[in-house]
């Protein structure tokens, strides 16, 4: 049952690319709508049933949660922007580099030891990532995504921000439950997003009403049934298991993109993506809990 929930979370999270592609909102507005609708769904439960937990908050937890929220906002913004310039498959597979960034941070900051086999898989995954980034240069691909390299760069940036907010959140989650942590996380992210909107003077309203449905889909499927169920799954599986199953996300995203938009990545990207998934999986198994 719990394994089904884990795969369901992965599938729901993969719908993020589809809803983002369907929407014609500016990325910053799409992000604001997604966060606001998510909070409308999540905050009432947290404030009614978990409000006593807010007493556990101290200065350190507040700072870490705020920083995590900032990184989460930049992660989603980079992800949405990447989808405007590159294909769904390439963007999602490159976001999987989050696992590699986490390991690099732990190696540099926590002085984590990596086995010889782990280093081999780590280096191979970087090679595969290079071929994903450099792929898709055919005439057809260039015509559809003339700035694909920019999109892939933004996808790598999204992976970096994801790694940072994951590491910060992992510490905070030791003291706060999932509803309280995610409510605080999304609140901080929304505040940062609204500040950017105000500074850039981007209109909040006046867009096609169907964009509201896409934003609601992002909030419910990708966030509530996606990211939140991942956090729930960590109570029943080791983090290595959750990370391994999350690697199926690009597969789900690519299938949905093919069904919805007829998007098919180049042969090089497909081969490099499969190689990257297996090398990251191999690394996770070498370094698992």
Language model features with spans:
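C-terminal transmembrane-helix exit sites in multi-pass transporters
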Residues: 45-46, 98-123, 251-271
């Amino acid at each position: 049952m719990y394994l089904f929930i884990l795969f369901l979370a992965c599938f729901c999270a993969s719908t993020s690319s589809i809803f983002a592609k369907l929407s014609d909102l500016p990325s910053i507005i799409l992000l604001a709508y997604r966060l606001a609708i998510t909070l409308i769904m999540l905050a009432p439960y947290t404030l009614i049933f978990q409000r006593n937990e807010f007493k556990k908050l101290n200065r350190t937890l507040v700072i870490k949660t705020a920083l995590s929220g900032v990184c989460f906002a930049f992660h989603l913004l980079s992800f949405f922007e990447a989808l405007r310039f590159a294909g769904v498959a390439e963007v999602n597979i490159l976001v999987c580099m989050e696992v590699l960034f986490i390991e690099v941070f732990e190696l540099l900051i926590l002085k984590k030891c990596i086995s010889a086999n782990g280093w081999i898989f780590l280096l191979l995954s970087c090679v595969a990532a290079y071929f994903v980034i450099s792929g898709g240069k055919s005439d057809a691909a260039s015509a559809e995504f003339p700035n694909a390299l920019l999109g892939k760069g933004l996808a790598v940036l999204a992976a970096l921000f994801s790694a940072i907010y994951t590491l910060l959140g992992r510490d905070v989650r030791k003291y706060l439950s999932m509803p309280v942590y995610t409510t605080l996380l999304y609140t901080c992210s929304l505040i940062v997003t609204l500040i950017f909107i105000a500074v850039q003077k981007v209109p909040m309203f006046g867009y096609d009403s169907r964009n509201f449905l896409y934003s609601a889909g992002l909030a419910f499927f990708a966030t509530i049934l996606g990211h939140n169920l991942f956090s729930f799954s960590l109570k029943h599986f080791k983090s290595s298991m959750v990370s391994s199953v999350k690697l199926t996300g690009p597969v789900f995203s690519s299938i949905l993109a093919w069904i919805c938009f007829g998007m098919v990545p180049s042969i090089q990207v497909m081969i490099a993506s499969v190689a990257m998934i297996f090398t990251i999986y191999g690394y996770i198994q070498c370094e698992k809990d």
